Amino acid sequence: MANVVVVGSQWGDEGKGKIVDWLSERADVIVRYQGGHNAGHTLVIDGVSYKLSLLPSGLVRGKLSVIGNGVVVDPHHFVAEVEKLRGQGIDVTPDVLRVAENAPLILSIHRELDAMREGSNSGLKIGTTKRGIGPAYEDKVGRRAIRVIDLTEPETLRPKVERLLAHHNSLRRGMGLEEIAVETILTELTSVADQILPYIDQVWRVLDERRKAGARILFEGAQGALLDNDHGTYPFVTSSNTVAGQAAAGSGLGPTAIGYVLGITKAYTTRVGEGPFPTELNDEIGEFLGTKGHEFGVVTGRKRRCGWFDAVIVRQTVRTSGINGIALTKLDVLDGLEEIKICVAYKLDGKRIDYLPSSMGAQARVKPIYETLPGWSETTAGARSWNDLPAQAVKYVRHIEELIGAPVAMLSTSPEREDTILVTDPFHD
């Protein structure tokens, strides 16, 4: 049985929540391996909506759910999200939820620093959620982070906090902010320790044992591959690696355990926040896609930018993430359009190119080269087989497969999990 990594193939918001929920019914273990509570997703089960941003989707189905070491954990948000799920009737206990003991913590100083930087009139606005994700990763790389396991050792926690604040207070002085006392952070941590410590574990061992026992493991990615810190539209990216390779590093399970990479791909393109977007539509078609597709962020409520499908960036993600097949989502949003365009290449300084360049200036200058396909007037909403789809919709899907170099393994035609056409089961070897 193959273990499956789910990765967004664009800039996030591709509809991973529904697909992960669909797959989680077939999985035994669900793992979050990167990011924090900055990327949300909505699950709709029996008419009830569950909005998650930190906890793995498998909790809603009672499956063992793991927060890996690649995730930065806001302990107060963790507690709040657990309580919210319990309020919706979901049983959340250490039997079904584990947190990597070596996961770094997000603290109030990270949130304040994030907001201060993003709100500054000087410098480059990245479009962060101001939830402290980036500064927490900075401290991890700088080897001064407070990790979950540190909450179990009060005798070593104080010197670690002192070292952390030596760095942060120097930053705060430069920004004209009041310095933070060691006791303030210690109180912040000890106030929540008893609520998070029952869930901690050496998750790499848990996952290795489950793998050897034949469990199906689903790795749940957040955001999208074009927000990857290395392979995305830098600097308009997130602070972690979002490509499929991070599933191994962010969970402690070796890369040979990964059997199938599923790229979640929207039938058009959206982006939240700043950064290049070659196929963006600032016209009535863009408004149509945003309105019909309900394109507003789960976490921030921010309106998403919308545009035509960009085969260049998805083809690039297929390569950088080793995608075996895609789950194409929101095809129904395109219903009713007379014609549909697909970006097949870019023009950069008069030259045709088939990739997204790495430099910020070049990314801003690329112009899309489009192919135009006829649309369809019939509905695709709720389709559960290829025979239910209009002929032109099938042609659109097949053309996407050709352009990106990967087959459609799943096709989603509404937010409801049953409205899914399965072509290839990712869990089958």
Swiss-Prot record:
It is an enzyme of class 6 (ligase). SUPFAM superfamilies: P-loop containing nucleoside triphosphate hydrolases. Binds 1 Mg(2+) ion per subunit. One of its GO terms (cellular component) is cytoplasm. It is found in: Cytoplasm. CDD domains: AdSS. GO terms for molecular function: adenylosuccinate synthase activity; GTP binding; magnesium ion binding. Pathway: Purine metabolism; AMP biosynthesis via de novo pathway; AMP from IMP: step 1/2. Mg(2+) binds at D13, G40. Homodimer. This is Adenylosuccinate synthetase. It comes from Brucella ovis (strain ATCC 25840 / 63/290 / NCTC 10512). The lineage of its organism: Bacteria, Pseudomonadati, Pseudomonadota, Alphaproteobacteria, Hyphomicrobiales. The gene is purA.
